[in-house]
Amino acid sequence: MDQIVLALQTRIALSEPTLLEGSVRVVQTKQGPALAQGAHRVRQIQFDLERCTVYLAERSREAQPMIYSSAEQWQNAPHKRVVLFGMSGLGKTYMSNILRDTGSWFHYSVDYRIGTHYMGDYITDSIKRKAMDVPYLRELLLSDSIYLASNITFENLAPLSTYMGKPGAEANGGVPFQEYRKRQEQHRRSEIAALLDTPEFIGRAEEIYQYDHFICDCSGSICEVVDPFDRDDPVLKSLSETALLVWIKGNAAHTQELVQRFDKAPKPMYYHPDFLIEKWTQYLADQTLQEHQVNPDSFIRWIYAEALAHRQPRYEAMANWGVTVDASEVARAKSEEDFSALIGQALATKAAP
């Protein structure tokens, strides 16, 4: 695990073979589409001792256009629009809540939009299926005597995560893998739709509710539903044309904390379909298990560190569409002024030669 954290934190120059000797070896190289004039390469690194996979990338040297080109333009903007992205637990919702509480920022939660608008019927139907197994509730439900619905809030997304579930033995609360993949695909489509709704909500926030500023609080899985290596990705183009993308970047200590937190309370999450199938197949082979024998919590604990490593180069590529702030600095921000200064500094840093 320490080697994974180190690899995530360390900038490895892939053009220097000597840095790949010893504990790691290149097992696969993927050439992604060019970002502007620079190519973005992703390499899969496998640790010889721990059979863990780390994905690393060289960032494109060519940044994408942003709606704020300088710190001065940002500070003087009458309407500030920001899209926060990064791993769950690094401060997106924390900062969004601070800004929302000022009364001048509209808080658009992508997870909330997914759970209430796009996946609300799926969630409600799953609740009704369980209710139909209880004779007392079945009778009331069939006679329209009761109303069943989830109660999702910005702070409580349990209905959504419970519906997403964990793959594995049903006796242990798991979901059959094919059903799990279906729900993952539902989430993928829903997240893309919710992200594409952002410009509409920017307009509604200003025109209807008279908010001066807008903060979009993205799901941690945004990097899995867009192609950050494609400068023509429709979702990233839509977002970057209407708001400033801001990556909240963690370090090795943050990664270790996230892993420890997840180990204590493993929660469902979305994975890129190719990555999920690859890791599911690997887990079954390594553990010599059939699908119905998999302990759901054991599997998602095992895949979590792999998922962090898989997402890192995708976040890196997304950073070309905006700016980067450190998660430690976000944690120290206590006000709108702190946040505004943080973004201004990030813009100044990016503009520096």
List PLM regions with ranges.
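Hydrophobic anchor at the beta1->P-loop junction of P-loop NTPases
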Residues: 84
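NTP-dependent small-molecule kinase module
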Residues: 287-353
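Conserved substrate/cofactor phosphate-moiety recognition/catalytic segment
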Residues: 101-138
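Conserved phosphate-donor/acceptor-positioning beta-strand/loop module used by diverse small-molecule
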Residues: 217, 237-280
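Hydrophobic positions on the alpha1 helix immediately C-terminal to the Walker A/P-loop
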Residues: 95
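The conserved Walker
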Residues: 88
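Glycine-rich phosphate-binding loop used to anchor ATP phosphates in small-molecule kinases
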Residues: 148-152, 156-238
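Conserved glycine(s) of the Walker
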Residues: 91
